[in-house]
A protein has these predicted regions:
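N-terminal subdomain of nucleotide-sugar transferases
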Residues: 1-48, 64, 68-70
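Short N-terminal targeting/anchoring amphipathic segment
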Residues: 2-5, 60-81, 94-95
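Glycosyltransferase donor-sugar binding loop
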Residues: 33-37, 180-184, 207-220
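Active-site proximal beta-strand in glycosyltransferases
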Residues: 86-105, 130
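Nucleotide-sugar donor phosphate/pyrophosphate-binding loop at the beta->alpha transition
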Residues: 101-121, 159-161
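Donor nucleotide-sugar binding/catalytic pocket of nucleotide-sugar-dependent glycosyltransferases
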Residues: 124-172, 176
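Conserved donor-binding/catalytic core segment of Leloir-type glycosyltransferases
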Residues: 166-198, 209
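Nucleotide-activated donor-binding/catalytic signature segment of Leloir-type glycosyltransferases, i.e.
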Residues: 218-234
Length: 234
């Protein structure tokens, strides 16, 4: 099976699904980006570590290779003229979109888009929607589009299996509690010592950090030391 995914540019959002399709199709998968990623996103780190063997530009020969006997086309933000050209060669056609009613549910703001979307997705074209948002299907349904023809985006979270949950808990860092204030009687910093005693007696793994200065500082250190908390928990 040959799959061609076309969009404006390749981002980390598409990596897990693209990696899976690349392997499932025995490397007959290609992602086509039609423009360079803008500087703002690059500065945010979007372009880092995005080199993949299946990514290419519209001018690459790999695209023409994929178009020969193309089975599936997935089209996101891509020039419509090219999308139609590629779509004619595909046996199965998917649109790829986030939600379209991001500023509310008023349809009166979108009359031009209504006609544009219907022109790009006529009822006689058997097209499907690959939803990049939980709201995509509902938004397009309000315009009478892709009803009953929407599919969820593919997620591939890593599953880590540990031989022992108890060992994992033992390796976890201690929970940290921060108390910050002046060490004064009416601030009741000594209550922190009492809390620490209760947590220790309950078998909790924790560390308390106290930040501040004041007349009770030495008293608090003595209380923590007498309770056996100074070196271990506070």
């Amino acid at each position: 099976m040959r799959i061609l995914f076309c969009s404006n540019y390749f981002t980390h959002h598409q990596i897990p699904l693209s990696d899976a399709l690349y392997e499932l199709t025995n490397h007959n998968y290609c992602f086509v980006a039609h423009k360079e990623m803008d500087a703002e996103r690059k500065n945010l780190g979007w372009g880092n570590d995005l080199v993949r063997p299946y990514t290419c530009s519209m001018a690459d020969q790999e695209v023409q290779k994929q178009l020969n006997n193309l089975d599936v086309l997935i089209a996101g933000s891509f020039p419509e003229r090219q999308t139609k050209e590629y779509g004619k060669k595909a046996k199965l056609f998917f649109r790829y979109s986030e939600r379209i009613l991001k500023t509310g549910n008023s349809l009166l703001k979108y009359p031009k888009r209504f006609f544009h979307w219907h022109a790009c997705n006529p009822p006689w074209r058997k097209a499907y929607m690959l939803c990049a948002s939980a709201y995509t299907a509902g938004d397009y349904a309000k315009f009478g589009l892709f009803r009953g023809r929407c599919y969820k985006w593919g997620y591939f979270p890593e599953t880590i299996r540990y031989p022992s949950i108890d060992d994992l808990i033992d390796r976890k860092a201690k929970a940290t509690i921060l108390w910050c204030g002046r060490f004064l009687d009416w601030k009741h910093p000594d209550d922190v010592i009492e809390v620490a005693k209760r947590l220790r007696d309950a078998g909790c793994c924790f560390k308390i950090e106290m930040i501040g200065t004041g007349e009770m500082e030495q008293q608090l250190k003595r209380q923590a030391s007498d309770a056996g908390l100074l070196e271990t928990n506070i």
